[in-house]
Structures are given as structure tokens and as C-alpha cells.
């Protein structure tokens, strides 16, 4: 895994720098997201691990992606195929998103709750996290019934567990001590 991240970093940096220069960061993220999903396809994974010539592999990959990739995105695929690095596309996407977040001074914040939160609740969480992290935040909302009630908020290494499940687990720990 760390090998792929090391391999992915220069590709992500090159793609990000190009995207910023051409004011197409959103488009590039969409292309990389699609390409990363294609690599996760079972048939494509077999193709990637096969002994195809890089040109054939690149053209097959580009054909599967169709119009989701522009000419520059196709060039990235060709270069990565030539170097045998198409398997690293999910990590390239991850690194690209990280570079974008750093560039835009935003933080990804996961909000996990038992039920969907209202816009007002999300706005309060967003404002509180922006104040705490001193940067803009992008909320990724997930629903997990095992939370029972309340909310779990994660950003990087920070976890704020305000869930009933978390409180019950802490209570059980105290009672067992």
C-alpha cells in the first residue's frame, strides 16, 4: 500500500499542477475518480495484472473510460500504463484530493449519524468544525444505525464521539474497571 502511495504522489502532483494551471481541478478530480473506479472492476483488474503490451493496455483502458477522459486524462493513462502503474490510480486520486484540500485550505470531515441530519444541524456542525480546525470543511455524511443516536465526527486523527453507542461503551469500561 505505501509503495502505491509513493508511486502515486508524483502522478497526482503532476495532474494537480496541470489542473490548477488550466483551471480544471474539478474536471480532473472527476476523471481520476472514474478511472480509479474502473481499476476496481474485476475484469479490468485481471487485464491490469495480465501481460498485455502497455500501448494495448492503455488503449483498452481508455476505451472503457470512453468520454469520461479528455485528451489530457488519456495522456496520463498512457504514461501510467507505459510505466506499469495503472494499479496505482486509486492512490493517485487520494493524493490528488489531498493536494486539492491543502490548496483550498479545506478539511474533509466525516459525520456519522443514525439518521439523516437536517440542513440546520449540518450547518452548525460545519461552523463548529471550521472554527475548531481554522479552515473550511467539507462534510461527508454517512448513516450508521449502530450509532443509535447522536453523532460521530472524524477529521484526520481527531474523533469526536457524541453517539449513544460511544457513551454506552465508555460507561461499560468504567463499570468494568
Swiss-Prot record:
<keyword id="KW-0813">Transport</keyword>
<dbReference type="InterPro" id="IPR026015">
    <property type="entry name" value="ATP_synth_OSCP/delta_N_sf"/>
</dbReference>
<protein>
    <recommendedName>
        <fullName>ATP synthase subunit delta</fullName>
    </recommendedName>
</protein>
<keyword id="KW-0472">Membrane</keyword>
<comment type="subunit">
    <text>F-type ATPases have 2 components, F(1) - the catalytic core - and F(0) - the membrane proton channel. F(1) has five subunits: alpha(3), beta(3), gamma(1), delta(1), epsilon(1). F(0) has three main subunits: a(1), b(2) and c(10-14). The alpha and beta chains form an alternating ring which encloses part of the gamma chain. F(1) is attached to F(0) by a central stalk formed by the gamma and epsilon chains, while a peripheral stalk is formed by the delta and b chains.</text>
</comment>
<keyword id="KW-0375">Hydrogen ion transport</keyword>
<dbReference type="GO" id="GO:0046933">
    <property type="term" value="F:proton-transporting ATP synthase activity, rotational mechanism"/>
</dbReference>
<dbReference type="Pfam" id="PF00213">
    <property type="entry name" value="OSCP"/>
</dbReference>
<keyword id="KW-0139">CF(1)</keyword>
<keyword id="KW-1003">Cell membrane</keyword>
<dbReference type="InterPro" id="IPR000711">
    <property type="entry name" value="ATPase_OSCP/dsu"/>
</dbReference>
<keyword id="KW-0406">Ion transport</keyword>
<dbReference type="GO" id="GO:0005886">
    <property type="term" value="C:plasma membrane"/>
</dbReference>
<comment type="function">
    <text>This protein is part of the stalk that links CF(0) to CF(1). It either transmits conformational changes from CF(0) to CF(1) or is implicated in proton conduction.</text>
</comment>
<dbReference type="InterPro" id="IPR020781">
    <property type="entry name" value="ATPase_OSCP/d_CS"/>
</dbReference>
<keyword id="KW-0997">Cell inner membrane</keyword>
<comment type="function">
    <text>F(1)F(0) ATP synthase produces ATP from ADP in the presence of a proton or sodium gradient. F-type ATPases consist of two structural domains, F(1) containing the extramembraneous catalytic core and F(0) containing the membrane proton channel, linked together by a central stalk and a peripheral stalk. During catalysis, ATP synthesis in the catalytic domain of F(1) is coupled via a rotary mechanism of the central stalk subunits to proton translocation.</text>
</comment>
<keyword id="KW-0066">ATP synthesis</keyword>
<dbReference type="GO" id="GO:0045259">
    <property type="term" value="C:proton-transporting ATP synthase complex"/>
</dbReference>
<comment type="similarity">
    <text>Belongs to the ATPase delta chain family.</text>
</comment>
Amino acid at each position: 500500500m505505501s509503495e502505491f502511495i509513493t508511486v502515486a504522489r508524483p502522478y497526482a502532483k503532476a495532474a494537480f499542477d496541470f489542473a490548477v494551471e488550466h483551471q480544471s481541478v474539478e474536471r480532473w478530480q472527476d476523471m481520476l475518480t472514474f478511472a480509479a473506479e474502473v481499476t476496481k472492476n474485476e475484469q479490468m483488474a485481471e487485464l491490469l495484472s495480465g501481460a498485455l503490451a502497455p500501448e494495448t493496455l492503455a488503449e483498452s483502458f481508455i476505451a472503457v473510460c470512453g468520454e469520461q477522459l479528455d485528451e489530457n486524462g488519456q495522456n496520463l493513462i498512457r504514461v501510467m500504463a507505459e510505466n506499469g502503474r495503472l494499479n496505482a490510480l486509486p492512490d493517485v486520486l487520494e493524493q490528488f484530493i489531498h493536494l486539492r484540500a491543502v490548496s483550498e485550505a479545506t478539511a474533509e470531515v466525516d459525520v456519522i449519524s443514525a439518521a439523516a441530519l437536517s440542513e440546520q444541524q449540518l450547518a452548525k456542525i460545519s461552523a463548529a468544525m471550521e472554527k475548531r480546525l481554522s479552515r473550511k470543511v467539507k462534510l461527508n455524511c454517512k448513516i450508521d444505525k449502530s450509532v443509535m443516536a447522536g453523532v460521530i465526527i472524524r477529521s484526520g486523527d481527531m474523533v469526536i464521539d457524541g453517539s449513544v453507542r460511544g457513551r454506552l461503551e465508555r460507561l461499560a469500561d468504567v463499570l468494568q474497571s
